[in-house]
Swiss-Prot record:
Mutagenesis / variant outcome for changing residue 13 to A: Decrease in antiviral activity
One GO term describing the cellular component: extracellular region
Upper lineage: Eukaryota, Metazoa, Chordata, Craniata, Vertebrata
Effect ascribed to mutating residue 7 to A: Decrease in antiviral activity
Variant or mutagenesis effect after changing residue 20 to A: Decrease in antiviral activity
Subcellular location: Secreted
Misc: The name urumin is given by authors from the word 'urumi', which is a deadly whip sword that originates from the same geographical region as H.bahuvistara.
Taxonomic source organism: Hydrophylax bahuvistara
Keywords for this protein: Amphibian defense peptide, Antiviral protein, Pharmaceutical, Secreted
Biological role: Amphibian peptide that shows viricidal activity against human H1N1 influenza A virus. It specifically targets the conserved stalk region of H1 hemagglutinin, and acts by actively destroying influenza virions. It shows a reduced activity on human H3N2 influenza A virus and no activity against other viruses (HIV, SIV, HSV-II, hepatitis C, Ebola, Zika, and Dengue viruses). In vivo, the peptide also protects mice infected with mouse-adapted influenza virus from lethal influenza infection. The peptide synthesized in D-amino acids is inactive.
This protein's name: Urumin
Record note on what altering residue 12 to A does: Decrease in antiviral activity
Consequence of substituting residue 21 to A: Decrease in antiviral activity
Phenotype when changing residue 11 to A: Decrease in antiviral activity
Length: 27
């Protein structure tokens, strides 16, 4: 289940999603 938002370069980006396999997808 992807989480809403992810830390990118130390900043929280609510448009990004971190998946359980470690992948990050940004809208």
């Amino acid at each position: 289940i992807p989480l809403r938002g992810a830390f990118i370069n130390g900043r929280w980006d609510s448009q990004c999603h971190r998946f359980s396999n470690g992948a990050i997808a940004c809208a």
